[in-house]
């Protein structure tokens, strides 16, 4: 074995050129850096996967909250429907009452017409279903209050003088105008109540509530579908299954390439040849006989570098007669 600089004689690569120790060290360093990079990338991928798991758990909790909110909204919708049914029953009762009031108003109108034809004006007040006794209308001064009103029984006396007929007609006209105003205001109020509690308005409100409920249900279903699709797309975008398989395959390929690029025993085979016996005038040919192994050992066809070194260490220096020289190509 001889060393010339950094070149190790006897160690050759596949092309037959000697291999230097520095190149071997550089290759080993590159391999170590590649392995470190792979380990670092694997650690980063693990951290990303942990972050993704945390985000997925947070999304699941939010979905559970949404489901609870959906259940709460369903209960509130049921309550609203029950209230709408109750309101519809109340509306029916109100309609029946309004119809009864209309009948009573018509009766009052007929009685008023009869009284006007007879030149006798009598105020009839209804309180609920009971009829209040009739009261005569009397004039009061403007400054007087309600406490100073005087209620008198019905007395219809024929006026003594002809001049009193004119005053009676003036009072009758004023009272008739007030009655007409009261009648108009009452009719307007009844019409407003009828319009508010009509079948069309109630049907419209019911339809609107149903449409709103259907829209809310559709929006909730759409949000659930969009969330599911988004989560699936996020998982596939971040770490798709194909990419995971590729990562595994790349790690396996790196290991195989490292194992292939590592120096093998065949590259470190030492070609042992005998020393040339050069005679004057003769051309000696290179011979490659088998190396005679030391005593106590059998001969082997291929002797590796490590075996030769160990043999030299055990046996000591080689004598000049049985010395072997490494053939230089």
Curated annotation (Swiss-Prot):
<feature type="compositionally biased region" description="Basic and acidic residues">
    <location>
        <begin position="310"/>
        <end position="329"/>
    </location>
</feature>
<comment type="function">
    <text>Induces rhoa activation and activates nppa transcription and myofibrillar organization through the rho/rock signaling pathway.</text>
</comment>
<feature type="compositionally biased region" description="Low complexity">
    <location>
        <begin position="279"/>
        <end position="290"/>
    </location>
</feature>
<keyword id="KW-0010">Activator</keyword>
<dbReference type="GO" id="GO:0033292">
    <property type="term" value="P:T-tubule organization"/>
</dbReference>
<dbReference type="GO" id="GO:0007517">
    <property type="term" value="P:muscle organ development"/>
</dbReference>
<keyword id="KW-0517">Myogenesis</keyword>
<comment type="similarity">
    <text>Belongs to the CAVIN family.</text>
</comment>
<feature type="compositionally biased region" description="Basic and acidic residues">
    <location>
        <begin position="242"/>
        <end position="260"/>
    </location>
</feature>
<feature type="region of interest" description="Disordered">
    <location>
        <begin position="274"/>
        <end position="329"/>
    </location>
</feature>
<feature type="compositionally biased region" description="Basic and acidic residues">
    <location>
        <begin position="201"/>
        <end position="220"/>
    </location>
</feature>
<protein>
    <recommendedName>
        <fullName>Caveolae-associated protein 4a</fullName>
    </recommendedName>
</protein>
<keyword id="KW-0472">Membrane</keyword>
<dbReference type="GO" id="GO:0010468">
    <property type="term" value="P:regulation of gene expression"/>
</dbReference>
<dbReference type="InterPro" id="IPR026752">
    <property type="entry name" value="Cavin_fam"/>
</dbReference>
<keyword id="KW-0221">Differentiation</keyword>
<dbReference type="GO" id="GO:0030017">
    <property type="term" value="C:sarcomere"/>
</dbReference>
<dbReference type="GO" id="GO:0005901">
    <property type="term" value="C:caveola"/>
</dbReference>
<dbReference type="GO" id="GO:0005737">
    <property type="term" value="C:cytoplasm"/>
</dbReference>
<keyword id="KW-0175">Coiled coil</keyword>
<keyword id="KW-0805">Transcription regulation</keyword>
<keyword id="KW-0804">Transcription</keyword>
<keyword id="KW-0217">Developmental protein</keyword>
<feature type="coiled-coil region">
    <location>
        <begin position="198"/>
        <end position="262"/>
    </location>
</feature>
<feature type="compositionally biased region" description="Polar residues">
    <location>
        <begin position="221"/>
        <end position="232"/>
    </location>
</feature>
<keyword id="KW-0963">Cytoplasm</keyword>
<dbReference type="Pfam" id="PF15237">
    <property type="entry name" value="PTRF_SDPR"/>
</dbReference>
<dbReference type="GO" id="GO:0005886">
    <property type="term" value="C:plasma membrane"/>
</dbReference>
<feature type="modified residue" description="Phosphothreonine">
    <location>
        <position position="292"/>
    </location>
</feature>
<keyword id="KW-0597">Phosphoprotein</keyword>
<feature type="region of interest" description="Disordered">
    <location>
        <begin position="198"/>
        <end position="260"/>
    </location>
</feature>
